[in-house]
């Protein structure tokens, strides 16, 4: 090697061509490096996916909290409506009972007065 070129441990030298084991070793090293690079890429993708999933989980938690608050409001409103309808139904039953009593009085009183003479 000349002194003008920097030392490269992966570059083939004149002596390496004579030894096929060294070439096989370097190709195996290159294969391993490619596998490592692929693994690193996959791990980075997985880390990004975990981060996205964490953001989505936070969003889902916020939506669940909002839903719980809405459910409580709905329950209170439903109870108010139920009580209002019960009171309205009670008033209707009382009016119906009053009408029946008035009709009975209108029918029975003249008959009673007529037979009492």
From Swiss-Prot:
PROSITE patterns: SYNAPTOBREVIN, V_SNARE
Sequence ranges on the Cytoplasmic membrane side: 1-94
Vesicular-side segments: 112-117
Bilayer topology annotation: Single-pass type IV membrane protein
GO cellular component: cell periphery; cellular bud; cellular bud neck; cytosol; endosome; endosome membrane; Golgi membrane; plasma membrane
Post-translational modification: Palmitoylated by SWF1.
Stretch list, region Disordered: 1-30
Keywords: Coiled coil, Isopeptide bond, Lipoprotein, Membrane, Palmitate, Transmembrane, Transmembrane helix, Ubl conjugation
InterPro entries in the cross-refs: Synaptobrevin-like (IPR001388), Synaptobrevin/VAMP (IPR016444), V_SNARE_CC (IPR042855)
GO molecular function per UniProt: molecular adaptor activity; SNAP receptor activity; SNARE binding; syntaxin binding
Subcellular location: Endomembrane system
Lipid attachment site numbers (S-palmitoyl cysteine): 95
Transmembrane regions listed in the UniProt entry: 95-111
Domain v-SNARE coiled-coil homology: 28-88
GO biological process, one term: vesicle fusion with Golgi apparatus
Short name of any one Pfam family annotated for the protein: Synaptobrevin
Keyword Transmembrane: yes
Family designation: Belongs to the synaptobrevin family.
PANTHER family cross-referenced by the UniProt entry: SYNAPTOBREVIN FAMILY MEMBER
Role description: SNC1 and SNC2 are vesicle-targeting proteins essential for normal secretory traffic between the Golgi and the plasma membrane. They may also be involved in vesicle fusion.
Record's protein name: Synaptobrevin homolog 1
Organism this protein belongs to: Saccharomyces cerevisiae (strain ATCC 204508 / S288c) (Baker's yeast)
Name of the gene encoding the protein in the UniProt record: SNC1
């Amino acid at each position: 090697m000349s002194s003008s070129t920097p030392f490269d441990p992966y570059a083939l030298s004149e002596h390496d061509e004579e030894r096929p084991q060294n070439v096989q070793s370097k190709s195996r090293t290159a294969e391993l490096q490619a596998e490592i690079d692929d693994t690193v890429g996959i791990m980075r993708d997985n880390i990004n996916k975990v981060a996205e999933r964490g953001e989505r989980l936070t969003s889902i938690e916020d939506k669940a909290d909002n839903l719980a608050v809405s459910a409580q409001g709905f329950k209170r409103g439903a109870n108010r409506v139920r009580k209002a309808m019960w009171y309205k139904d009670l008033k209707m039953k009382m009016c119906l009972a009053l009408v029946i009593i008035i009709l009975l009085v209108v029918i029975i009183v003249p008959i009673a007065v007529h037979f009492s003479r």
